[in-house]
């Protein structure tokens, strides 16, 4: 009631419990918290950025995207990132660690609570913030399971999307476990030399391996895949690139 539905993280505010019970909770349990450090609102593209400070003083960012009375939350899964993608701002940060399940959940809870105060609610969640979600696989999946739980907020798994740079072993595991969670792939080129330049992870998991894993995913789950493709002048946006992309898909 208090944690998941009312999103209250101070035992003292659990008003339907006796003072004695609240004191017992405080002695036996610890509730992690985030601290708002910054909140930026952009009227131009209807986005809001939330900068949170964790218990160890590290910072993470979540982005709220509004569109036609629907709200999508872009959450982080790691502090920094190991992959060094050429077009990503997180690549400029040092990788520090994976986020805990609680730290992923709190991004959702804090922003959902913020929206409820305006009589709004989150529609979708995308793991497209800081970090590679499939390099924090267990915690990402567990956080989704908890939000999906009937004991939690009972959010449909279809409302979640995990975006990956192409971690092939994790895609295979994701396929075998048959999650009803949407999958997105950061692609940006279907030429190995170009994609490796943009995304060094392609050297470890080249396009042939990635495509094989994705084809198997579609065959087994019957789910659609979203492909992300940033147009970069003189690199991946010629007419031939479009035809090559169509052939790959």
Describe each PLM feature range:
Residues 1-71:
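Flexible, acidic/Gly-rich N-terminal and inter-domain linker regions that tether
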Residues 66-112:
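Canonical Radical SAM [4Fe-4S] cluster-binding loop centered on the CxxxCxxC motif
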Residues 112-124, 129-249:
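Conserved AdoMet/S-adenosylmethionine-binding subsite of the radical SAM
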């Amino acid at each position: 009631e208090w944690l998941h539905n009312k999103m209250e993280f101070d035992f003292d505010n659990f008003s339907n419990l006796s003072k004695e019970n609240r004191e017992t909770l405080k002695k036996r349990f610890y509730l992690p918290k985030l601290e708002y450090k910054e909140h930026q609102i952009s009227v131009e593209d209807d986005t809001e950025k939330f900068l949170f400070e964790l218990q160890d003083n590290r910072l993470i960012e979540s982005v709220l995207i509004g569109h036609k009375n629907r709200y999508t939350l872009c959450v982080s899964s790691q502090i920094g990132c190991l992959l060094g993608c050429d077009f990503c701002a997180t690549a400029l940060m040092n990788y520090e660690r994976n986020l805990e399940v609680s730290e992923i959940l709190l991004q959702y809870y804090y922003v959902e609570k913020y929206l409820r105060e305006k009589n709004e609610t989150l529609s979708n969640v995308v793991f497209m913030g800081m970090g590679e979600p499939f390099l924090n696989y267990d915690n990402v999946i567990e956080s989704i399971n908890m939000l999906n739980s009937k004991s939690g907020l009972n959010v449909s798994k279809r409302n979640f999307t995990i975006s990956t740079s192409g971690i092939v072993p994790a895609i295979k595991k994701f396929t075998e476990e048959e999650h009803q969670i949407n999958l997105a792939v950061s692609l940006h080129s279907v030429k190995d030399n170009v994609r490796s330049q943009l995304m060094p992870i392609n050297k470890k998991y080249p396009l042939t391996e990635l495509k094989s894993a994705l084809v198997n995913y579609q065959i087994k789950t019957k789910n659609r895949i979203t492909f992300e493709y940033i147009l970069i002048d003189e690199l991946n946006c010629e007419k031939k690139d479009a035809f090559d992309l169509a052939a790959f898909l």
